[in-house]
């Protein structure tokens, strides 16, 4: 079984410049999900929205081509792809000739689909779109909508996940609201390098205590976990401790190595967020 410790994270790596799908390193979701009480089917829907800003290949005449790639990985996949391996994989396109942008897109879709669905009884596919330079100026920047939790003047003393900080007012009328914080920080599971993000929490149900929620989000500050795992932990902690009727947790992390990863988890099926970067990304 692939584990994060066996990946290229934190290790010196040779950069292949000829296409090599074997560089992709899938990691099972199940182990980390078991830590947060998920055994079998996950109690949420959603996807991991990836943006790759450093993608280049050669056309058949050897001229370099560039694009921005948007990749959508359903959260039902049994694996994630370790991000450094994905960077190395994309770099392997650099000196490889392809007939068209469509061929590159199809190759990425097939390779990533095989990696994340590996071993699944009913494998599916991932979504891949490539944005070419003539469309770059149509890539918007937009901050997450919602009431900013960071306005609250709270004392923060916990820097490992502390779900006991979460509470909801079940003796009051239910509400529907969207809350946002830009203070999310965690660390890479393997290297300990900081990961910075913004998080949006939309829910219906008993009103969540906002001060406690902000303190809870800050408590991830020294926690070592991948982006996808942090968002699933946040979702499960709010779901079990605050017991909302509906819940969506969406985080956008700043890029590293030309990649950003933006997980979305929802209690009910809904249309995926458009993959729009924030100013910090």
Curated annotation (Swiss-Prot):
Pathway: tRNA modification; tRNA-queuosine biosynthesis. It catalyses: 7-aminomethyl-7-carbaguanine + 2 NADP(+) = 7-cyano-7-deazaguanine + 2 NADPH + 3 H(+). Its main location: cytoplasm. GO terms for cellular component: cytoplasm. It is an enzyme of class 1 (oxidoreductase). It holds the Pfam family QueF_N. SUPFAM superfamilies: Tetrahydrobiopterin biosynthesis enzymes-like. The keyword Isomerase does not apply. Its EC number is 1.7.1.13. Keywords: Cytoplasm, NADP, Oxidoreductase, Queuosine biosynthesis. The active site is at 188 (thioimide intermediate), 195 (proton donor). HAMAP family: QueF_type2 (MF_00817). Catalyzes the NADPH-dependent reduction of 7-cyano-7-deazaguanine (preQ0) to 7-aminomethyl-7-deazaguanine (preQ1). Homodimer. This is NADPH-dependent 7-cyano-7-deazaguanine reductase. It comes from Acidovorax sp. (strain JS42). The lineage of its organism: Bacteria, Pseudomonadati, Pseudomonadota, Betaproteobacteria, Burkholderiales. The gene is queF.
């Amino acid at each position: 079984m692939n584990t994060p410790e066996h990946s290229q994270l934190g290790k010196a790596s040779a950069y292949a410049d000829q296409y090599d799908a074997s560089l992709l390193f899938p990691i099972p979701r199940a182990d980390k999900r078991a830590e947060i009480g998920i055994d079998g089917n996950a109690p949420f829907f959603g996807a991991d929205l990836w943006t790759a800003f450093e993608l280049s290949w050669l056309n058949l005449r050897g001229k370099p081509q560039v694009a921005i790639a948007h990749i959508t990985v359903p959260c039902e996949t049994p694996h994630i792809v370790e991000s450094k391996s994905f960077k190395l994989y994309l770099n392997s396109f650099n000196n490889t000739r392809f007939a068209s942008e469509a061929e590159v897109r199809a190759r990425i879709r097939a390779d990533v689909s095989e990696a994340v669905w590996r071993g699944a009884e009913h494998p599916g596919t991932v979504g891949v779109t490539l944005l070419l330079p003539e469309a770059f100026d149509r890539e918007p920047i937009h901050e997450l909508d919602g009431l900013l939790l960071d306005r609250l003047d709270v004392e923060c003393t916990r820097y490992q996940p502390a779900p006991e900080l979460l509470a909801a007012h079940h003796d009051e009328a239910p509400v529907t609201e969207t809350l946002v914080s830009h203070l999310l920080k965690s660390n890479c599971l393997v290297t300990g390098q900081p990961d910075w993000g913004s998080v949006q929490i939309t829910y219906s149900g008993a009103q969540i205590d906002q001060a406690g929620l902000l303190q809870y989000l800050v408590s991830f500050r020294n926690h070592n976990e991948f982006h996808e795992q942090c968002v699933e932990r946040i979702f499960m902690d709010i779901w079990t401790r605050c017991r909302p009727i509906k819940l969506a947790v969406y985080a956008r992390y700043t890029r590293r190595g030309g990649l950003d990863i933006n997980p979305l988890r929802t209690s009910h099926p809904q249309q995926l967020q458009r993959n729009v970067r924030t100013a910090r990304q």
